[in-house]
């Protein structure tokens, strides 16, 4: 994947302002609420019976932070995202058996969360750069499946 200097700047510039715990928790919670079939991968998280339960679940918040912290590795390593996520791809494919489509869904939700948090600072150019990034990350995570 080739990144323009502008794309890199838009991604890293916004990333520097992201509250990883808040945005990560919100993104994972939204995934579980909007696409409830994804909850089956999180049975050990306890009560996910309603949007209120999901949003208030500390395990959802903690794992969301973990997911977005990991996503930060992509931001730091834009030129080697496949290598950055090779072990996570293996884990999600071989051990957890996660449908790779879920990576795309979570990426799209992350873009929604960033747009909600950053409003007018999340310009169309910024959105395009982030949409490209979440696609590249989703593809890297799904790599072990191919």
UniProtKB/Swiss-Prot annotation:
GO cellular component labels: blood microparticle; haptoglobin-hemoglobin complex; hemoglobin complex
Globin domain span: 2-146
Pfam families (alphabetical): Globin
Tissue specificity remark: Red blood cells.
Entry's Gene Ontology BP terms: hydrogen peroxide catabolic process
Sites where the protein binds heme b: 63, 92
InterPro entries: Globin, Globin-like_sf, Globin/Proto, Hemoglobin_b, Hemoglobin_oxygen_transport
Key words of the record: Heme, Iron, Metal-binding, Oxygen transport, Transport
One GO molecular-function entry: heme binding
Main function: Involved in oxygen transport from the lung to the various peripheral tissues.
Similarity comment: family membership: Belongs to the globin family.
Subunit structure and binding partners: Heterotetramer of two alpha chains and two beta chains.
Name by which UniProt lists this protein: Hemoglobin subunit beta
């Amino acid at each position: 994947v080739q990144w323009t200097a502008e794309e890199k700047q838009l991604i890293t510039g916004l990333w520097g302002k992201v509250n990883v715990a808040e945005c990560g928790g919100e993104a994972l919670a939204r995934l579980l609420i909007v696409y409830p079939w994804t909850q089956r991968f999180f049975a050990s998280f306890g009560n996910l019976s309603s949007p209120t339960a999901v949003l208030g679940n500390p395990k959802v918040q903690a794992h969301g932070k973990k997911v977005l912290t990991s996503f930060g590795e992509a931001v730091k390593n834009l030129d080697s995202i496949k290598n950055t996520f090779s072990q996570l791809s293996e884990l999600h494919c071989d051990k957890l058996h996660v449908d790779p489509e879920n990576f795309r869904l979570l990426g799209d939700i992350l873009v929604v969360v960033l747009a909600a948090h950053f409003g007018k600072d999340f310009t169309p150019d910024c959105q395009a750069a982030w949409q490209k990034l979440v696609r590249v990350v989703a593809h890297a995570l799904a790599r072990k499946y191919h």
